[in-house]
Amino acid sequence: MAVEEIHAEMVSSVWKVLVEPGSAVAAGDTLVILESMKMEIPVLTERAGTVGELHVVEGEVLQEGDLIATVVDGTTAPSRG
């Protein structure tokens, strides 16, 4: 079973969380939306599966490299964009 770890690519704030642990996701689905320098940055999953763990909450400030979520291969869902 493969696990995708999704990390913050820059210092940012968690603006909106769109999934929860156990949510089925398709490749390309948006998991959370970050905000940095007044820009909204969608964080996407690269694989279909199930959200295993969610490590952020709305309003939290992230540093580059912080773990946002894990996605476990398996359950798939239609893309929600």
Question: What spans do the regions from the language model cover?
Answer:
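Short beta-strand-turn/beta-hairpin segments enriched in glycine/proline and small hydrophobics
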Residues: 1-13, 30-46, 79
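C-terminal structural segments of small proteins and small subunits
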Residues: 54-81
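Generic alpha-helical hydrophobic packing signal
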Residues: 5, 11, 18-19, 40, ...
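Short histidine-centered loop motifs in beta-beta connectors
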Residues: 16-20, 24, 53-56
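Short, conserved catalytic or interaction motifs in soluble domains
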Residues: 19, 36, 41, 56, ...
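A structural signal for short beta-strand/turn segments enriched in small hydrophobics and glycine
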Residues: 22-31, 36, 59-68
